[in-house]
From Swiss-Prot:
GO BP of this protein: CTP biosynthetic process; GTP biosynthetic process; UTP biosynthetic process
Name by which UniProt lists this protein: Nucleoside diphosphate kinase
Active site: H117 (pros-phosphohistidine intermediate)
Keyword Metal-binding: yes
């Protein structure tokens, strides 16, 4: 299996609920390790640039407003098939359609406040990771198994 990197964002609703540690724990329990992590407040320009692919969509303005409404946690996750695994752990975009035990089913409010973002393809993961993290800020390391 391929070792990949993917971008994960804990959105403002996840930060506000105080579940950052729970979310990171779920990724780690499923074999995805954070190799870069940062708590930040996105500017309007950063959010518009990151979500530019949705600019023509009717929800774009609300998405930018929400993503700049409070702090977010930006992470690069690394592991086998990280992109697909991350999406599986997050669950469906609409929490009402998400499987039990996924982050969105357990913590999200609605399709807008759905707690987390994850890259949707290996190609987009590379673009998204580089948008927020220059390579120098990403640190590879090996996990040591606890006895």
């Amino acid at each position: 299996m391929a070792i990949e990197r993917t971008l994960s964002i804990i959105k403002p609703d996840g930060v506000e609920k105080g579940i950052i540690g729970k979310i990171i724990g779920r990724f780690e329990e499923k074999g995805l390790k954070p190799v870069a992590i940062r708590l930040t407040q996105l500017s309007k320009a950063e959010a518009e640039g990151f979500y530019a692919v949705h600019k023509a969509r009717p929800f774009f303005g609300d998405l930018v407003k929400f993503m700049t409404s409070g702090p977010v946690v930006l992470m690069v996750l690394e592991g086998e098939n990280a992109v697909a695994r991350n999406r599986e752990i997050m669950g469906a975009t609409d929490p009402k359609k998400a499987d039990a035990g996924t982050i969105r089913k357990d913590f999200a409010t609605d399709i807008e406040k759905n707690t987390v973002h994850g890259s949707d393809s290996v190609e987009n993961a590379k673009i998204e990771v580089s948008y927020f993290f220059p390579e120098v800020q990403v640190h590879a390391y090996e996990w040591k198994k606890l006895a």
